[in-house]
Amino acid sequence: MEELKEFFDAIEELKALSKDGWVVVVEGIKDVKSLREIGVEGEIVIFSGFSSTAERLNGKKVIILTDYDSKGFDIEKGLLRALSSYGNKPNVELKKRIFRCIKKDVTKVEEL
């Protein structure tokens, strides 16, 4: 029950940060659709390569919300490196909080 509360708290924080101007980075269009369905209203960017995505997000507050699988972790790691070259420190803690609660059942953003 506590994990479920933590999950919903993390989703509410995601929605609030997005509404406050944070940009959410995801892997694909299904992820965008899923986040819209749960009420994320702000800008959502689909990952399109490390350099181009980092350049596009330069100077913005960023939440990396890639899938909880090896591809998602590789994208997260590369984006962290690329964004840090611009002096940007994206939020990855929210992803950890969301998937920590549900990782046994859900590993993809589109399944949220």
Question: Where do the protein language model's features map onto the residues?
Answer:
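TOPRIM fold recognition
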Residues: 29-38, 45-48, 52-112
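Phosphate-handling DNA/RNA-contact segment within nucleic-acid enzymes
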Residues: 1-23, 29-36, 56-57
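Short active-site oxyanion
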Residues: 19-24, 42-43, 61-62
